[in-house]
A protein has these predicted regions:
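Sequence-structural signature of mature extracellular/luminal beta-sheet repeat domains
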Residues: 1-302
Length: 302
């Protein structure tokens, strides 16, 4: 696929959000900041949450909502920036809210049901302004946390756990009819789907899991963040087999390659929603290309 690099020199970019003014907002996880990219090489730091800002989304209040994973230890390996274990200065995971006019960062929540969030990763709002988000957990020298899928009702102060005990929950998205939540699990290379009875209420797929498996990748491939298409396909960033894997609701999949081992996310924009912005994280680049199908327009934009 043909693409252009519109921004370089970023420190592990993730979470692209396409703004109405044509700019793209990303996080720089290693730099612990949120950056606006103008597409001509110009960048501007708009907020400094610290920790590890990760997934981003515009909320119903017009603010920028942030999954903050608390940070990683990074290694520079042959010119590639590689994230790893939980850092010594880790002070917990949290959901944050950024006022785009001032850059002020507020903590929305850091516990669910009395349990601390470990590494919130990605988030999506439904049309009513309810929030679904994942907790990826943290990795340590000899073990790692389990993670799960969570729900925060619009206007609520406390979230609830929808399902837990997943290896490494990452990207999350809603089907166009908002009857299904899709969740990528990193270490298993598996795409899960959670059917909803109503917002925040899942129909358990089995006595063992709330979700059902849509697809599992062959060989060693890791899933990262994702975006939905208007047709209901899942475009999930894929690590090691660097690129974007498109998965149909029925489980068929195909791969679009990009030149980075750690491709972490994709976002759609443009009048026809076929401009795709892809974060090439280990090389610190933001790429732009034309996608073969329109992306799903998000419920809230700014």
């Amino acid at each position: 696929m043909e693409f252009e690099i519109i921004t370089s020199g970023l420190r592990f970019p993730e979470g692209p959000v396409v703004m109405a003014d044509g700019s793209i907002i990303v996080v720089e996880i290693e730099k612990k900041c949120i950056t606006r990219c103008w597409g001509d090489g110009k960048t501007e730091v708009i907020a400094t949450p610290g920790g590890g800002p990760n997934g981003l989304a515009i909320g119903p209040d017009g603010a920028l909502w942030v999954c903050n994973n608390g940070g990683f230890i990074y290694t520079d390996m042959d010119g590639l920036l590689i994230p790893g274990n939980c850092p010594d200065d880790y002070d917990g995971g949290r959901i944050e809210r950024v006022d785009l006019s001032t850059g002020k960062v507020d903590r929305v929540l850091d516990t669910v049901g009395g349990h601390p969030l470990k590494g919130p990763n990605d988030l999506v709002f439904d049309k009513a302004g309810n929030l679904y988000f994942t907790d990826h957990g943290k990795t340590y020298s000899r073990h790692r946390d389990f993670g799960g899928l969570f729900f925060l009702a619009n206007g609520a102060s406390e979230a609830k756990e929808l399902d837990f005990h997943y290896s490494s929950p990452n990207g999350v998205g809603l089907a166009p009819d908002e009857q299904t939540v899709f969740m990528a699990d990193t270490m298993t290379g598996r795409m899960w789907a959670f059917d909803l009875e109503s917002p925040g209420i899942i129909k358990p797929a089995s006595p063992f899991n709330g979700g059902r498996v849509v697809a599992t990748m062959p060989g060693l491939q890791y899933f990262d963040s994702l975006a939905m298409t208007a047709a209901g396909n899942v475009c999930v960033a894929t690590i090691l087999n660097g690129g974007i894997t498109t998965i149909t609701p029925g489980g068929d999949f195909h791969h679009t390659a990009f030149p980075d081992l750690i491709v972490t996310n994709i976002a759609f924009g443009g009048d026809d929603m076929q401009d795709a912005y892809v974060t090439l994280s280990s090389t610190g680049q933001l790429a732009k290309c034309r996608w073969p199908e329109p992306g799903l327009k998000l419920n809230f934009n700014a």
